[in-house]
Regions:
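Structural/interface elements that position substrates and couple domains in central-metabolism enzymes
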Residues: 1-316
Length: 316
């Protein structure tokens, strides 16, 4: 605010902090939960001076009825937002690393994460095929840049961001190993949106997945119940569905409820050989019982007998 917004606001000759208040209050809601959280989640406020911060505190307390936390300065309020997003990003990166170990060691990370959280001191988020959205993959870069300007390097934050950025590549590499290469394969992505039930695709992992798959020589199609085919095309994707035929593997990117109830036997009949469940949406046994290979985040690859010898030897 102080560096970029203040000069614009003062360009007309008025002085911030004396002629008008300047307050920063970070957004602490998310799509589809805005109204549910507005009056419940504490509003953090900071101002260009104490009077501005107090005015912001009074405004939100009066009109939202929400608890308010006055942290003092504009920079302090900005820091609160960044620290929350960075916590989420680094926590997910840790979960992704634990999941990667589990995949190799023949473990199922999901019940183990649940068990870890029971001590009351561990609060692990859950792994996935990638991190998208307006905030989590973006905001760490703001603090990294700010630290660089101060002569600092925030190595853990950089590492967490790099781990999460690599996740699509690493998971597609697992799929490639399972299918003994992706050149000439048809891979179908389920979900463009970065979150279930939300028609938003900012920094969606689907883009990274498509890039990695194309670079591996695969044909890539996608579907999302929240987007028309023309909208997918406008965003650089090729629309399709499993029933069109010729699909070798399905990659779940978004856990839309429309994708929950799948006839895996029908998928097998259509020629699908492997499923990469990027959001732990499906029961692995259901996939395997249909004779498909199941690849899950944090779960060693498993296959039904119909494809174990035809595709690849997998961990059991």
């Amino acid at each position: 605010c102080r560096q970029h917004l203040l000069p614009i606001l003062e360009s007309g000759g008025l002085k911030g902090g004396s002629d008008f208040h300047i307050v920063f209050s970070p957004e602490r809601v998310k799509s589809q939960l805005v109204f549910a959280r507005l009056s419940k989640t504490p509003k953090v406020v900071g101002g260009i001076n104490a009077a501005s911060a107090a005015a912001g505190e009074q405004f939100y307390g009066r009109w939202l009825g929400a608890p308010t936390i006055n942290v003092g300065t504009l920079e302090a309020a900005e820091f609160v937002k960044l620290s929350g997003m960075i916590y989420r990003d680094v926590n997910i990166a840790l979960a992704n690393e634990l999941a990667r170990f589990a995949e190799t060691a023949g473990l199922n990370v999901w019940p183990l994460l649940d068990a870890s959280d029971t001590d009351g001191e561990t609060h692990l988020l859950r792994p996935g095929i990638g991190v998208g959205g307006h905030c989590t993959p973006v905001y760490p870069h703001f603090l990294i840049r700010g630290a660089t300007l101060l002569g600092l390097r925030l190595e853990l934050i950089e590492l967490g961001r790099n781990i999460n950025d690599r996740q699509p590549q690493q998971q597609i590499e697992r799929l490639a190993q399972t299918l003994r290469g992706l050149a000439g394969r048809h891979v179908h992505i389920l979900g463009l949106a970065f979150r279930p039930r939300v028609r938003e695709d900012a920094y969606t992992t689907a883009r990274s997945l498509q890039t990695v798959l194309i670079n591996s020589g695969a044909k890539v199609t996608i579907e999302d119940p929240l987007y028309e085919a023309s909208e997918l095309v406008a965003r650089g994707f090729v629309p399709g569905c499993v029933k069109d035929g010729g699909v070798d593997a399905v990659v779940l990117n978004t856990a839309h409820p429309e994708f929950e109830d799948v006839d895996f036997l029908d998928w097998r009949a259509q020629g699908v050989k492997a499923v990469l469940d990027g959001r732990a949406l499906w029961c692995a046994d259901d996939v395997i019982d249909a004779g498909l290979i199941y690849l899950g985040i944090g779960i060693a690859a498993r296959a039904g007998t119909a494809h174990e010898t035809a595709c690849v030897e997998v961990h059991t």
